[in-house]
């Protein structure tokens, strides 16, 4: 009888890639002509937050677009960003605090486990382990089908698949 195969579903942030994107976006904001004199900056605001500052709402949103483009070029999913609808205003400065989401929330973990149970009723088991899920099955083909299904699903979480056994 074949041993069970498994993998883990996690949602982790590659901090080095995000840091590279912040540095590239900061460099572009300082060099681009349309950002001259706007005081637009992008910087880390704690361990899991990035802050964009500018003197107008339009420039703050344009700086956010620059940051998003740098993240995409670095291969980081935009689903990790928690961006407010409008920038916070303090005096003449517009601040856009961006939180980076890491880990799978219990609600999303239950939702993913339910999707797996509905799609693959026999042979595939999903176990919630803190902020990650372990999916196991006797057939590796089923596990590959689960990965394909989750990649095509419209979840608001960036998923990575690790620890294939």
UniProtKB/Swiss-Prot annotation:
One term under GO cellular component: cytosol
Secretion signal, residue range per the UniProt entry: none
CDD domains (UniProt xref): YajQ_like
GO molecular function: nucleotide binding
Any one Pfam family match given in the protein's UniProt record, by short name: DUF520
Family: Belongs to the YajQ family.
Reported function: Nucleotide-binding protein.
Protein known as: Nucleotide-binding protein Tfu_2672
Lineage, broadest ranks: Bacteria, Bacillati, Actinomycetota, Actinomycetes, Streptosporangiales
């Amino acid at each position: 009888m074949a041993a069970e195969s498994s993998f883990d579903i996690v949602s982790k942030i590659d901090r080095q890639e995000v840091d590279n994107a912040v540095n590239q976006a900061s460099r572009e904001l300082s060099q681009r002509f349309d950002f001259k004199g706007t005081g637009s900056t992008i910087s880390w605001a704690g361990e899991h937050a990035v802050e964009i500052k500018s003197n107008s709402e339009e420039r703050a949103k344009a700086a956010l677009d620059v940051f998003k483009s740098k993240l995409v070029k670095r291969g980081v999913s935009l689903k990790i960003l928690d961006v407010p609808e409008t920038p916070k205003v303090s005096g003449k400065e517009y601040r856009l605090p961006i939180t980076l989401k890491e880990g799978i929330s219990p609600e999303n973990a239950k939702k993913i486990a339910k999707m797996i149970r509905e799609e693959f009723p026999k042979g595939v088991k999903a176990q919630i382990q803190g902020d990650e899920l372990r999916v196991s099955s006797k057939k590796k083909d089923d596990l590959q089908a689960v990965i394909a299904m989750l990649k095509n699903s419209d979840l608001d979480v960036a998923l990575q698949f690790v620890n294939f056994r």
